[in-house]
Amino acid sequence: MAWLEDVDFLEDVPLLEDIPLLEDVPLLEDVPLLEDTSRLEDINLMEDMALLEDVDLLEDTDFLEDLDFSEAMDLREDKDFLEDMDSLEDMALLEDVDLLEDTDFLEDPDFLEAIDLREDKDFLEDMDSLEDLEAIGRCGFSGRHGFFGRRRFSGRPKLSGRLGLLGRRGFSGRLGGYWKTWIFWKTWIFWKTWIFRKTYIGWKTWIFSGRCGLTGRPGFGGRRRFFWKTLTDWKTWISFWKTLIDWKTWISFWKTLIDWKI
């Protein structure tokens, strides 16, 4: 074949003449550099410097002290804030102002005496309004559920209510009062004082004077009816089902301070 005739041509390949060039590789010229001790010392010195940089950084006492100080400052900032007596006093002051202001204000005997005095004055004003209707006019009437029923309702609520020292109020037991207004006006301290102050006779009077369930006193204009429970049932309900602890739990948890404020 024709390609077999080229075998003799392969024997005369010029690449075979380049074999002596492999012996003169220029990379072998760097061998004296590696054998140079000074060069090796420089390389070792560079490696030592590169390795010792971190070591010197870690062994630097001043730098470590600075790191410790910075970490201590970062950690102590919160501690100093919590341990700061001024900040704690401010927080305590805010708590006292927000939560305890009403209780301290209501526990003040002078304030309680002033409230009792105003209640007496309001009652006297009611009596005066009944005795002197010409001077007071329609302001003396109690409104929609007044002394004479709905027939005497003037149609003008602002003129139908009773005006006391504190303006138009709708407390229970007043003329034109509403028991819900009186209940939500009470704070937790007042509730506790009011409930534990009640005796069994007081509870019986309050329960049997309700108009529809445990709704409080209806006032002079409403009908006074007895509840469907008998005295024995109410006595059992008060004595056993609602004990002292149950009342305290009911006031403390079911009606919290936030719920009462709302």
Swiss-Prot record:
Annotated tissue distribution: Brain; predominantly expressed in normal neuroectodermal tissues and in certain malignant tumors.
Any Pfam family: LED_rpt
InterPro entries: LED_rpt (IPR048506), WKTW_rpt (IPR048507)
Keyword Transcription regulation: no
Transmembrane domains' residue ranges: none
Region (23 X 6 AA approximate repeats): 3-140
Sequence repeat feature ranges: 3-8, 9-14, 15-20, 21-26, 27-32, 33-38, 39-44, 45-50, 51-56, 57-62, 63-68, 69-74, 75-80, 81-86, 87-92, 93-98, 99-104, 105-110, 111-116, 117-122, 123-128, 129-134, 135-140, 141-146, 147-152, 153-158, 159-164, 165-170, 171-176, 177-182, 183-188, 189-194, 195-200, 201-206
Positions of the UniProt region annotated as 5 X 6 AA approximate repeats: 177-206
Domain of life: Eukaryota
Keywords annotated in UniProt: Repeat
Region (6 X 6 AA approximate repeats), start-end ranges: 141-176
Note: Autoantibodies against CDR1 are found in patients with paraneoplastic cerebellar degeneration.
Protein name: Cerebellar degeneration-related antigen 1
Organism: Homo sapiens
Gene: CDR1
